Amino acid sequence: MPRLFTAIEIPESIRRKIACLDLPAADVARITAPEDLHITLHFIGEVSVSLCDAAQVRLRSVITPAFEQKLRSAGVFANRGRPEILWVGVDPSAELLTLRDAIGDVLTSLEIKLDTREFNPHVTVARLKRPAPSVAAEFKQRNSPWYSGFTARSFSLYSVAPGGQDPHYRVVEEYSLRAL
């Protein structure tokens, strides 16, 4: 059964900028491969092949315009107070939220249950291998302020590669947004 999510791919020019961030050493953090950098819109999870096929087709009905997407500052997600995820923030623009809502409407029409937690758009750049508050604080301090941006011209339905292969994510289908 495929494990799916929808996301906006990060363009190569922005990947290069993210690669220049002051990231922790490999013994402390697992750095996200550049080709895996993305902004998750909806995590779908494991679904049947038939539901994957239906989602792939129905997502073609999402029609929203391309938009300018801003990235801003570095941050950390913690679990029970322990830092785990290092990220670059994504401006929750009206256009991004409109796209996310349109995708969500399609997915819920297929009876796919979506995450109900507050949407906090970001690009995961690394995962700490063990809790390291000083490493997380240093990451934020060394990489803030940080700003960039790009034109979001499409979104994709992704599947997660089995067994930790690189890249970890495979585009099932890419969906173009309307030209600006």
Per-region residue spans from a language model:
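Histidine-dependent nucleotide/RNA phosphoesterase domain, centered on the 2H-phosphoesterase fold
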Residues: 1-180
